[in-house]
Design a protein with these regions (language model features):
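Conserved alpha/beta cores of soluble small-molecule-handling proteins
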Residues: 1-113
Length: 113
């Protein structure tokens, strides 16, 4: 998978890593991946964090359609990032998505993204 990366020009101030409350600090970037009927998932990209724009007809607004991606990443003492069972996480996400009529994605692509 070829993921296009666009880096932000406005980096946020880094928080105190010894005091990180949940849901207060956000990354400088976000992952986006388009879906088109008949084509499937395409154009994966990492872009600067921004507000989302969506149609008033979006299913999520009418039916509360959402799934939670709970992948955990840890920084090792050697400076390497460790992911905890990413393949199983992506498989669970696909199962949840299927229940809400959200199209499945390739698990390997999800892990790479």
């Amino acid at each position: 998978m070829d993921i296009k990366v666009t880096l932000t020009q406005n980096k946020k101030e880094k928080p105190d890593y010894s005091n990180l409350p949940f849901g207060v600090y956000y990354t400088d970037h976000m992952f986006e991946w388009d879906y088109t009927e008949g084509i499937g998932w395409h154009d994966p990209r990492i872009v600067p964090f921004h507000n989302l724009e969506m149609s008033p007809c979006s299913m999520v607004l009418h039916y509360g359609q959402t799934t939670f991606e709970g992948l955990k990443a840890y920084l090792g003492k050697d400076g390497e990032i460790r992911l905890f069972r990413p393949e199983l996480n992506m498989e669970r996400l696909n199962i949840s998505n299927e229940r809400l009529v959200i199209p499945k994605f390739n698990v390997e692509d999800g892990v790479e993204a």
